[in-house]
Amino acid sequence: MAVFLPVLSQAQLVKMPMDVAPDGTTYEQVSGKSFKVNGTLVPYCVPGAKGKAWRLDGYSSYLQAQIDPTVLTDKKQLTFSLWVAPESYPMMKLDQDGEWFTTMLGNVKLDDNNTLSGDKGGFAFQLGSRGSYKFICHVNKWQVKCEPKAKLSRYQWNHLVATVDGVNKKVTLYNNGELVASKNCVKGEITPGGSTLYVGKSYVEDKVDVFYLNTYNGLLDDFEIYDGIRTDILKEKAENAPVLTYSPERYAGDILRPSFHGMPTAGWTNETHGATYYNGKYHVFFQKNPNGPYMSRLNWGHIVSDNLYKWEEDPTAVSPEEAYDKKGCWSGCVFTDDELTGGKPNIFYTAVDYGRATIAQAQPADDDLLTWTKKAGNPVINGRPNGLTDDFRDCFVFRNGTDLYMIVGSSKNGVGVTTLHKYDKSTKTWSNDGKLFFSGSNRNQDGTFWEMPNVTKIGDKWLFTATPLNTGVGVRTLYWTGSINADGTFAPDSRTPKTVEMAGFSKDGYGLLSPTIFQKDGKTLMLGIVPDKLAGSENYKMGYAHTYSLPREISLDSKGNLIQKPFSGLAAMRSETSFMMTDFDLTAEKDLDPVQGRSLELSAKFVVGNGDFGFSFLGNGDKKVTLTYQPNSGMLSLDMSGINRIFNDGVFGGVYNYALPTPVAMGEEMTLKVFVDHSIIDIFVNDTYAASVRVFPRDVDAVKATAFAKNGSVKMTSLEAYVLDETRVASGISSAVSEAETNVVYGSKGFVNYNLASPNCTLYIYDLVGRCVKAQQISDTTGKVQVANQGLLLVKIVDNKQKVVGQYKVIV
């Protein structure tokens, strides 16, 4: 295939625009040679500093190209130019204290320790694991390093220009037009080096599992070499701001990636610590490895939403860049308090430095919470108190009356505990005397270490949650209810904990873990991590690891039991592709067509009789996932064992069972709600019990959804199903209101009649399978709309701001 080259500067010796085609092809314009990049996913490009820029993922993306070193031969003056915008610094080593370097671009064969392999010669722009950067070149085979004092800026373009002057014996390095380093060199010719150009990775093969450690994470754009000293290019400005998040189009062919569950656009995530609502947005902070879908050197990631189902990723909030947190910025909380934080959200996190864990604090520099500054004088708690027998991490701050406290997860005598630290308002310091907030009773029940402790006041009770390690059934999240004593300690109503998830759905680290809990508009909301539990090789291919549960509205009943139901705002995702029936007998299996796919909501009220009933979804032929309630045993079962899937749950074998504490009596209603989002299922039973489960169906045609009854018919009070669309801000019928409850909208023969408080609305009229049979704008407050359909219809009223102001059930 012919490559049509642009007209180049006469002094230009090498030009690589970094515009990579979907098939992985890129090229060097002067020679016309093309090359193929490496990477697990289709190459991703965005508008760059000049044209298109290549987005490297930090664990699989790199290029080994070829240049002709003879074009650099006999040169005494050269100018090298490269545009870079890193998201993070390269991983390099998993658990070692130090800084190691990789090659962003160059032809020098240097290993992680900058040891030269082969003949002395060549050049390289290098980046270190702690943000140091340098330019290396050779003049008369003498190596010269230009090493700026400052770190390379993340999330912005750095235009790196290096001039090598063997006539005037000077090497200089500029960043965005500013001189950042210079070195003297010997007089003579520049040593060109080898023909292999390493882009995004040095020549060595550093891996953990299947993931490269010495790869660059971020944007690379035009690389150029000019004959002579070209200071005029220092004035060049980037054409576009760098965009380091990935758009949904990157995963357009991915049938497994969730679409309305929170998660970063790439990389590895874990605990959702610190959900909050601030300045008109929901914010969720979380553990993130931006360098790939594996766990190491953790940052605080940040996603935002208007509605808790459509998410956008912001830059990382806190990263391991200080001496006290250089190993990682681990979990903690976000806390807002007029006295402690000046009314703005502050981050409290576990800072780890390869020797110990401390507690540090960070403050926002703007009202959008985009930029954070670590508090001067960090850490605020300088290590674990005496008397503990294990680690010290995952802080949580709360107020009780006039007192401010912090609790931190730990262990004492082999059982999980939380330490208690009181804030001294006069000295503005935290106590650290070894006092305990609450302790477990025994290892089998309470585990050996408590991660992610959280305490929230709900009504007149306090809810305490923790995620213990090494219980008798492994890792799962537990809760207690009780009160806070005058000294800040916790007094549980019972020493015996209860499980947040339906017990048979959560053990050994499956299900929702380590929840974050926050309050907004009188609601207490909770969401947590739901791990993939996949092999690293699967995450390598996908480009991401783990997701979060749907937000749940929680409360406590009179006995201190946790009550969980889906966040009411999720109804706004419902599209017009829907199914709805009321008051009928369900026999055998009922197809919910036109509702099918991988983004679904299924909801029904079953009247309990003798026969089993439930839903099936992700179905194709006789292979399907089923959720079944068995009235005779009171058992709820989720069975995915028969579908073609990526196997991830050896302890369950694809079958999850939960015996309801109190089986639903014969003749009473049972409500089942299921949200399906590609590889995660959120289940709610009677708006009381809940579980989140991962499933990874391989079959692209596994989209069918049904409701079913076995061993006889089941009376149905209602059956609803919706295709969900996370891009919607207002959508299909979210509930049906009977005519007896309102006379604003009512039916008569051939007409839907209305008597409205405000004019200038649109009436949408649907049949029971969700088809819009009429849409009519109305400018008055009283009138009627003629319809051809008869029977039960659903009416939605939308005002001129596209807000749903009423939804009704009428008979025509």
Language model segments and positions:
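Short, aromatic/His-centered strand-loop micro-motif at the edge of beta-sheets
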Residues: 135-159, 645-671
